[in-house]
């Protein structure tokens, strides 16, 4: 019995020494394991550098605008390196709202009245401590338009404001009716085809600071609205330039892409519930003209638009609304310099619907098309908490237009 106990102790000690050795050496200490790790790392790095990290495709209608961007907005000619562990479209799209920081911004709210008796909520960042533009009357103003159900609290809006603050600029965020907590005074919300509210906001802001450089930037649906406005008004706008990000160019193609099973599960259904939530709190305003019970049963953005948006804005059919809402139709009429950043892997805006040929025919338009980036993603760096590629494009472009925009008229 004593012998057996001694043998067990010896066996236990030997086993413990063996396990300790394995822990110390581990997988990485194994020649085979280390070779596998190194081999995989080299193969992945080669794949990433050859197939993922690429320079954007530039589609610019005019030689003057092309030279201007190369000289003053070089980021659009540089290789975009998506986050190495998250470069796929859906991953970038889903991760950005959760991983990017939210710089603190103190707003001043203003409610302006509309011709139909409604009101629009504007959130101002006045930047009164600007060291570069002490005189408020000439301080550059950037009008920011958030996405579908977005407000001034979105992280991408906060980052644009933070970058504008560094440049000394003032910002104002255009919150669509009823989404920012303000009361809805009339039975009307918003859509990207109807530009009346945006026209009122542009006129109002310009009337306050007529001597200040005035630019606009729109994200997703905000960019669609901005492009539709510019396409309708041409060069007769107080805006000197504009930028759009992750715009859906063809509403039919966007809807079809978002209705594919995985995209519907990840994005479409959630956004539909957000739209329903935004109108539910104002339900009493719509009951006379819209069947709200059917609206609340919608399972997709298309169904919501058919039962609510198209009806509210007087379209005969959903197809009529989607045709009018698609900014690709009006791109040829844009009359001021506009930079449009899209990722060709964006499931919200499929690449085949990007109006490349139309852009080539308008000297005021520049399309910047990255291979990756998703929808309002454009994450870069190992831990993409701070600035994205989209942010860098925004900052360089607005600075270029404010400081060197006069060169375009001389080219």
UniProtKB/Swiss-Prot annotation:
Catalytic residues identified in the record: 220, 346, 375
Localization, UniProt: Membrane
InterPro entries according to UniProt: AB_hydrolase_1, AB_hydrolase_4_CS, AB_hydrolase_4_sf, AB_hydrolase_fold, ABHD4
Reactions it catalyzes: a 1,2-diacyl-sn-glycero-3-phosphocholine + H2O = a 1-acyl-sn-glycero-3-phosphocholine + a fatty acid + H(+); a 1,2-diacyl-sn-glycero-3-phosphocholine + H2O = a 2-acyl-sn-glycero-3-phosphocholine + a fatty acid + H(+); 1-tetradecanoyl-2-(9Z,12Z-octadecadienoyl)-sn-glycero-3-phosphocholine + H2O = 2-(9Z,12Z-octadecadienoyl)-sn-glycero-3-phosphocholine + tetradecanoate + H(+); 1-tetradecanoyl-2-(9Z,12Z-octadecadienoyl)-sn-glycero-3-phosphocholine + H2O = 1-tetradecanoyl-sn-glycero-3-phosphocholine + (9Z,12Z)-octadecadienoate + H(+)
Gene Ontology MF annotations: phospholipase A1 activity; phospholipase A2 activity
EC numbers for this chain: 3.1.1.32, 3.1.1.4
Keyword annotations of the record: Hydrolase, Lipid metabolism, Membrane, Phospholipid metabolism, Serine esterase, Signal-anchor, Transmembrane, Transmembrane helix
Pfam families in alphabetical order: Abhydrolase_1
Tissue expression as described in the entry: Widely expressed with higher expression in liver.
One GO CC term on file: membrane
Free-text function comment from the UniProt entry: Phospholipase that may play a role in phospholipids remodeling. May selectively cleave myristate (C14)-containing phosphatidylcholines through its predominant phospholipase 1 activity, cleaving preferentially acyl groups in sn1 position. In parallel, may have a minor phospholipase 2 activity acting on acyl groups in position sn2. In addition to (C14)-containing phosphatidylcholines, may also act on other medium-chain-containing and oxidatively truncated phospholipids.
Protein name as it appears in the record: Phospholipase ABHD3
Species assigned in the record: Mus musculus (Mouse)
